[in-house]
């Protein structure tokens, strides 16, 4: 129960931060038009969709609380790659971002393995601070 509350807080922090930056959340969950149909998790990790002026983004929110951070990274990279390809087919004008908490950025993404992942997988990242309830850094490739 405590973990679910933490995960919900992470999700809300990202939504609130995007709205504070002028984004309009258009979908709290995103369903891909695929066979079989894929949709994002209803609990911990969610994909949200937002628009600002002419920009459109989809954001896969990760907590990096559930497993080892290396295992979380591997899972996140697999989802990111699949979601990005599906999004290119479904809505090519929408950019996919992976939102990660500050602790995950510092422990994984700012280090060698994370930097390689950012480069090889062409990750677009939003680093968010749960305590301050705001995005700290946008990394665009």
Enumerate the predicted regions with their spans.
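Nuclease catalytic cores
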Residues: 2-11, 15
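Short beta-strand-loop-alpha-helix junction that forms the active-site gateway
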Residues: 61-73
